[in-house]
Amino acid sequence: MKRLIIFDLDGTLLDTLEDLCDATNYALRSENFPERSLDEVRNFVGNGIRLLIERAVPQGTPPAVTDRVFGVFKSYYADHCMIKTVPYAGIADALRLLKAQGCLLGVVSNKADAPAKAIVAHYFPAVFDSVVGEREGVRKKPAPDAVFETVKALGCTIDELVYVGDSDVDAQTAQNAGCCCVLVSWGFRERALLESFSPSAVVDTAEELLKELIK
């Protein structure tokens, strides 16, 4: 069993898709842009909220208009990020069991730092030893910077780490960090894509994830 487990947030621990979609469409409506479907937003997420909005606005939208939409999104999502969001089945229990086993637990997310911390504190109080979201001056995933920051802050080494995520971005993050990777199939990407990165495992339930992590 690894000493430190770092989790992605959206699509791994929490199903945040409906709140993200609602905030995206609220922001798009502010400029009378067409709304996006849940499946479209699913494909847009993973690289941070700025890229989510850049992908959601119509092609050819002037940068200044994209900036306005992004501002509306950030303001709305900050107040509406926990309306429909729910933990995936079995995740809360799995985290408690890992904590009881003495594991250090962290979150590294491309979600903005403030809402990432607020959401984790709300849904998983007193569970995580570190939560790091997107901040200015720190490269977001798949760059390994926030992973390295977490490893150092918790007094661990890369060899003591397993990274858990649900996307190609997460697989690339683990590869760039040089650490073990487990991917979950219940998130925002198809299983075939996840398997193409040859992770240590692709799991389908929280119970399977727990078994993989405590081996």
Each model region followed by its residue ranges:
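Short beta->alpha linker loops
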Residues: 44, 48, 86-90, 111, ...
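Asp-based, Mg2+/Mn2+-dependent phosphohydrolase catalytic module
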Residues: 1-3, 113, 117-215
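Generic enzyme active-site microenvironment
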Residues: 6-8, 108, 164
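Active-site neighborhood of HAD-like aspartate-dependent phosphohydrolases
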Residues: 2-43
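Alpha-helical substrate-recognition element adjacent to the catalytic core
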Residues: 30-60, 89
